[in-house]
Amino acid sequence: MTKKEKKSFNQSLAEWKRFIYNPTSGEFLGRTAKSWGLILLFYLVFYGFLAALFTFTMWVMLQTLNDEVPKYRDQIPSPGLMVFPKPLSALEYTFSASDPSSYRGYIEDLRKFLKPYTLEEQKNLTVCPDGILSEQKGPVYVACQFPIFLLQACSGMSDPDFGYSQGSPCVLVKMNRIIGLKPEGTPRIECIPKDENVASISTYPNNGIIDLKYFPYYGKKLHVGYLQPLVAAQVIFSANSTKKEVTVECKIDGSPNLKNQDDRDKFLGRVAFKIIARA
Amino acid sequence: MRQRKLEIYSVEHHAATDIKKKEGRDGKKDNDLELKRNQQKEELKKELDLDDHKLSNKELETKYGTDIIRGLSSTRAAELLAQNGPNALTPPKQTPEIIKFLKQMVGGFSILLWVGAVLCWIAFGIQYVSNPSASLDSVYLGTVLAVVVILTGIFAYYQEAKSTNIMASFCKMIPQQAVVIRDSEKKVIPAEQLVVGDIVEIKGGDQIPADIRLLSAQGCKVDNSSLTGESEPQSRSSEFTHENPLETKNITFYSTTCLEASTSPVGTATGMVINTGDRTIIGRIASLASGVGNEKTPIAIEIEHFVHIVAGVAVSVGILFFIIAVCMKYHVLDAIIFLIAIIVANVPEGLLATVTVALSLTAKRMAKKNCLVKNLEAVETLGSTSIICSDKTGTLTQNRMTVAHLWFDNQIFVADTSEDNLNQGFDQSSGTWTSLSKIIALCNRAEFKPGQESVPIMKRVVVGDASETALLKFSEVILGDVMEIRKRNHKVVEIPFNSTNKFQLSIHQTEDPNDKRFLLVMKGAPERILEKCSTIMINGKEQPLDKSMAQAFHTAYMELGGLGERVLGFCHFYLPADEFPETYSFDSESMNFPTSNLCFVGLLSMIDPPRSTVPDAVTKCRSAGIKVIMVTGDHPITAKAIAKSVGIISANSETVEDIAKRCNIAVEQVNKRDAKAAVVTGMELKDMSPEQLDELLANYPEIVFARTSPQQKLIIVEGCQRQDAVVAVTGDGVNDSPALKKADIGVAMGITGSDAAKNAADMILLDDNFSSIVTGVEEGRLIFDNLKKTIAYTLTKNIAELCPFLIYIILGLPLPIGTITLLFIDLGTDIIPSIALAYEKAESDIMNRKPRHKKKDRLVNQQLAVYSYLHIGLMQALGAFLVYFTVYAQQGFRPTSLFHLRIAWDSDHLNDLEDNYGQEWTSYQRQYLEWTGYTAFFVGIMVQQIADLIIRKTRKNSIFKQGLFRNKVIWVGIASQIIVALLLSYGLGSITALNFTMLKAQYWFVAVPHAILIWVYDEMRKLFIRLYPGSWWDKNMYY
């Protein structure tokens, strides 16, 4: 039996060799040079045609799009909440007030992020009346000023360390931009620590108000210079608490059409993050 | 081992030589098997020294410890029964159900999917260890894969079991009774309880309950056709006449039938049981059959080949991209998940179940046409059959003697030999016929069993031997009520046929009341009858029998004999009234009446005629490129005559012997190439080397093997298989069963077939009609073509399923389609359409092309794979991507922004991912969009699979020629695709685990232009194939 197998192995080896190059018929991998030429030419033409066709259909499809507004916005009916700066992994801020290198990254991110919000940057923007939606007809859409001082202690103006050096870090909470979203009521962001004995939260602007004048958003292309309204949450650990670790939950409140509860989407209208302040 | 002889299997005395040869060949093949066989043979050999036929009654009594008059004692019988087991054949070993089930669980692609499932679980395990909150996705996937394997396995098992069950009910044997003498008493016991040494009584019509040494019998005849293929009854008596136990007259064999035992008054033959159960000749042949390995069916080989191709592609692409993924710095776990996804995308999970359904649909269709298929895979085998080795008796012939020719008035008349026999159109006006018909009716001892008036004549049961039965039925058809004629012509004396006289005689009063003469009628061997005659009747008048008349008689006799027919001569004589007055007392012992100088009336010849449908079926097989070979145990002359009459040897072809005779030269001088036909006897065959047999099989298109033993049938089948032919064997007798088993497809006869034959066969012709085989061939070829279409259809979408993963890995697009979604295509939308292709009608006349070459015309060939994967598959992938890009673009993510977005897109912590319009998306919102993308991609594939389904209806003809609406099931399939997709999207869109969303109505139509393009492209392909057959295009594009 082994003998037979050996033989067939040798045979198959010879067959393979002949398959790779057959000297009698000049076939290489089962085809002659001419045949290979033909088949390659065929595929060149065929795939060239398919590529052209695909490009064309894609082009046709792109023609159906509008540069300013996406055709459908039904998949994002309600905005998510997100915090800033973005920790490296998960939503956990770990820092030590006594070690500036532990929070330098956060501060730099915040500064960079807040750059468009500085007063010089916004001077071309409109001062809009508070409390009402600034609906516009175009063709030119103006953006409303978001004076950075609204963020008070977290504005970086009085405290360039955004509270990190004092052990009371600032985290910015922002609502995702959605084109055409018109919040109803008086939307505000409410942040609550999980354990009130450990820390308390101050929100700026006061009460975490998000002014309606920043809505609706008209899209990146039309709404040049648009500034997203921000809410800053400053975590102030209780002096008597030894534990310097708290989970903070922020959610949109006060607006009936902005959802803050969804079983599947943990970030729809709410966000939870954790602050760990090491000694 | 070389010396071992198994002559018992052989009809010929010396057939053992070929058995030796066979053993020698087999021995080289497989050492293990040889060892096993050796033991088996050793055991057989001991019992093969059957010498009971040589022993005297006394010796037998001592040998078996029994008493011929009193029989065995019940206690002794019970002892022997316990010792030797019941007198029944051990049924062939059944594979345990659980093994069958497990085979389904691991066969085909299942192993691959099991590996995938296990990898999934392992991947989750590793993830879980590092992060207990890891997502359960891979657990779901693994479970789903396992469930898919188990479900398809259960399904395939159920299908198999269903077709096997039909067989089980079919093969139940009727319990048999035997009359046995035990404790000096006659008892009726089940034949199963017979033991060696039992004294049994046999009546005419009984099945012989075991191998029996006859002790006393008169005029006993047995039908050995199921054992040797001889259609003529063999007479049996208590004398030892031959060395060979098969030839000697004093042994009868298990499962043969006793036709007639003893003269009147109804008596019985007695005999002693010498072998029971598996130790009988039949039992040994049956065990020989079960020793023959079961070959894999051609379709099983094809499916295996196909599974290898697809699994090869799946695994190599999977591993290639695993390596690429690792090189691209993907996490190894992620790379494993990709690997699984690629395998899942490549494996057509539903296909094997679909193939099973398609085969069982064909099996059902064939069962309706009286072809019962035992093994589902055998459905296709007939389609690829290139050689049919057919038994003669009972398969090609009706297995009953029938009057074929008559000779009277110096003229040969042809009688109708068709199954109903009603159309006897020869000239019946001559006075000679009147006399002849009277002799036929009167000089005959056969009788119809009473109470059969309503049964058609040819179907009535007759008591009597085959020739007499034929004559009785013949005269009943022509003359009407023969019993009545016999009553009117009262029989006064008779001498039954015996082998020394070779004639049968009876004397009757005539029905004419004015004619007081007695009529003496006689029939027998023609030369004997002629000797006794001095006159001959021509046109109703007696003439002296001169030399020229005698010459004419001989010519006619030779001619009829040359047709392989059994010829009988008939004569009569009116006894003069003065010498033999009414009161004359005839005596059969002293024969006090003249038996010479009679008047010769005519000859009549009989044959077991071919079934009327056979010639047509043989012609059809021929035009389908199938070689029909006759293999029979019967005599060469008869075999050749039947072969000629059914067209196995066509009218204008000659054998070497024919040419020699025609040209008047010696057989050796004939150029063998001139002969198209060959008649080979078992004796010649046993002297042939395998090479000579190969040469014979290769060079002669028309071959008849005669006087072959069961062993030789096997050798012939093996010889055919060496020619790379797919061999079908048809047969009904026990002697056929080894060959039936060895053949690629064994076809047994349902009505006349023995249980052994049915057990060994893969297919059963319920109506015993050879022409059903043609139906089988047609259906088999059709299903092969249609399976090609089904597979092509199913493979196509694999590319569309695979590309998303490749592009996801390489270009980092958000995943276009999920693994579970893929399974919904493979096992949801595509199932019914791929079954629907099994209903497709043939494109052209499939019975006019050659059978496929086992090694060249594969089910899945390169062209099919290339065309499905690289042409249609790729077009489908593009179409599906178009839908996918459309969905993303219209929601805000333009195609260009999607590239290399994967890491951000898949990050759970990134909940403000910005799209091209400045909007921000949370992780879940993106996820939901991704599912919408899955659904869109799914719908894209589904829509194009509709086009794929339509184009796969034909491989060469235009769809419009085939008819869009002829196969309604295709439309059921299309409807099912759409309905399943709608249900998934709109009905189950809210179930998260399934990853489907409600897709906007317009997205269902995005891929339609691509679908139309696929159709147009394929029509173009077919057009060029039709326009330029044999061209480069044809070679590369026709699958």
UniProtKB/Swiss-Prot annotation, chain A:
InterPro entries: Na/K_ATPase_sub_beta, Na/K_ATPase_sub_beta_sf. One of its GO terms (cellular component) is apical plasma membrane. The keyword Cell membrane applies. GO terms for biological process: intracellular potassium ion homeostasis; intracellular sodium ion homeostasis; potassium ion import across plasma membrane; sodium ion export across plasma membrane. The keyword Disulfide bond applies. Residues 186-279 are annotated as: immunoglobulin-like. Residues 1-35 are cytoplasmic. Keywords: Cell membrane, Disulfide bond, Glycoprotein, Ion transport, Membrane, Potassium, Potassium transport, Signal-anchor, Sodium, Sodium transport, Sodium/potassium transport, Transmembrane, Transmembrane helix, Transport. Disulfide bonds join 128-144, 154-170, 191-250. The C-terminal lobe folds into an immunoglobulin-like domain and may mediate cell adhesion properties. Belongs to the X(+)/potassium ATPases subunit beta family. This is Sodium/potassium-transporting ATPase subunit beta-3. It comes from Oryctolagus cuniculus (Rabbit). The lineage of its organism: Eukaryota, Metazoa, Chordata, Craniata, Vertebrata. The gene is ATP1B3.
